[in-house]
Amino acid sequence: LIKEVVIDEAQDYNKLQYHIIKNIFLRSNFTILGDVNQTINPYYKYQSLNELKEIFTEDCRYLELCKTYRSSQEIIEYTNKILGLNHIQAIRKKNNHPVVFRTEENLKEQLLTDIMALKKNNKSVAIITKNDVEASMIYELLKEDLENISLLNTNSEKFNRDMVIIPSYTAKGLEFDSVII
């Protein structure tokens, strides 16, 4: 008999999967952890994990944690603006402000300049792209100038953490000193 089931990254499971899990572990208690803003599957559209109360009805409590220890205050303020939130607080001290630029012209030169500047003060730098195709394109653009750069995609077995290009859906759980999106 399994008494306690812990599910992490709850936002990456759909409601059918939760019904199946609940029916497999009929006599178990559940602890379900997640963040709807970190979903990697665009088809799972939870407004809140509180929606899971429909499935886990017995003695169900919903708690929302509003402090983060991972990201700096500037990153949290920036993402709060994008997500329309204002209740998430950063515990980590101030760091550099996010820098936003949009460019297709001189993309290679801009990326090389930014990577070199970031590498001066940071051990690891990641370029996070929308998908494998975009990651491969950026890798092809930079590989001759940056011999230590690696491409991490769904087929990769290992990668160089110091300088990596990675699609967003494979970046989950990884941490880098600096990130270019």
Language-model regions: role of each:
Residues E4, Q11-I181:
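Conserved helicase motor core of SF1/SF2 NTP-dependent helicases
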